[in-house]
Amino acid sequence: MENPFEITAVVAREILDSRGNPTVEVEVYTPISMGRAAVPSGASTGTHEALELRDGGKRYHGKGVRRAVENVNKIIAPELIGMDVTWQRDIDTLMLELDGTENKSNLGANAILGVSLAVAKAAANALGLPLYQYIGGTNAYVMPVPMSNVINGGVHAGNELDFQEFMIMPVGADSFREAIRWVSETYHVLKKVIAEKYGKDAINVGDEGGFAPPMKEVTEPLETLIKAIEEAGYKPGDEIALAIDAASSEFYHPDIGKYVVAGKEYTREELVDLYKELVSAYPIVSIEDPFQEEDWEGFKLITRELGGKIQIVGDDLFVTNPKRIRKGIEMGAANALLLKVNQIGTLSEAIDAAYTAFRAGYGVVVSHRSGETEDATIADLAVALNAGQIKTGAPARSDRNAKYNQLIRIEEELEGIAHYPGRKFRNPFF
């Protein structure tokens, strides 16, 4: 008798992401289901991330992924045919063994992740379960508070802002649907505020749907956001709070051993003082990557100084890697993890990273990358983990709204039991 959960085919192809660059899409088939997943790609990448395999050469300016696609079709697929699609961890472990490297540089993290996520989706579909419930079980019910990146700087923009992202968080909303309405309304007012001050050229949107007006001083976007929140009819801090992704690796100058913000040099201690000034002047509740990816002492210092008051998120510091997360926990560096599935390369390892963080009392922010697709897996993952937070761009561009729309559907499915944590986003159960 045919096993309905047996993998019958694994097919990979090259598709385009939101930046028009190639990425990997994978389909996994069983006799009764199919799962499809597409892999995202980052612009500001941590040195310790799992390796994304690109072809090089002239085709797609070297960014083709035919090698990764071939690795799925020729190497991974034959090994998976006949396996039970619900054996997620076994399948992920097998792919790690097939690759045989620490950073997945042999087969490519983009090949392995595409298969890993497609396997989970095919299994969920075979069982007739929504993906968040398949991954998280019956206890998956916490909706995430959106961290919406509405003003861009750094490598995401062509302006002079050194900090990469300025975000709004609707902490005073009662539900996800209400939260996303507040974000959308504020975003549209922000567009008007920026156009009035900086002109129409300043309201073109970046990779993640945010605006990149010609600002330089870090206080400019914060002042602009406060104005937009108030004009949209909301209270800054009480209803909509602010968050920053400094992405400090991008403005650290190793030749002088200092950080350069708006043309001014800062030592580690001086940069902590700048963050403290910003937190006391504005309703900032979260700062991501306040120091460069190897500045463990800087993270330790800011966590000691501000960690009792706000969330300190490690992205490039941790790169979703359980070993680096454990080091941070031991040192008291940061108090939250930015979870990007493509930094580590399999669903099982991403879940392990999240639970390593949770067990230490750290928060977890499930995150997109700047190069995305219509794939909305991270929306389901945020609910599956009860993470309480998601970072997936401005409420603009279909690649970002695909995630928000999926969360609206999930909240509707969980009618009566869905919990929106609001201000308790870092520890939604306490």
UniProtKB/Swiss-Prot annotation:
InterPro entries: Enolase, Enolase-like_C_sf, Enolase-like_N, Enolase_C, Enolase_CS, Enolase_N. The active site is at E208, K340. The keyword Mitochondrion does not apply. Its cofactor is Mg(2+). Its EC number is 4.2.1.11. SUPFAM superfamilies: Enolase C-terminal domain-like (SSF51604), Enolase N-terminal domain-like (SSF54826). It comes from the Archaea. Pfam families: Enolase_C, Enolase_N. Signal peptide: none annotated. Mg(2+) binds at D245, E288, D315. (2R)-2-phosphoglycerate binds at Q164, K340, R369, S370, K391. One of its GO terms (cellular component) is phosphopyruvate hydratase complex. Pathway: Carbohydrate degradation; glycolysis; pyruvate from D-glyceraldehyde 3-phosphate: step 4/5. One of its GO terms (molecular function) is phosphopyruvate hydratase activity. The keyword Mitochondrion does not apply. GO terms for biological process: glycolytic process. It catalyses: (2R)-2-phosphoglycerate = phosphoenolpyruvate + H2O. Its main location: cytoplasm. It is found in: Cytoplasm; Secreted; Cell surface. Binds a second Mg(2+) ion via substrate during catalysis. Catalyzes the reversible conversion of 2-phosphoglycerate (2-PG) into phosphoenolpyruvate (PEP). It is essential for the degradation of carbohydrates via glycolysis. Belongs to the enolase family. HAMAP family: Enolase. This is Enolase.
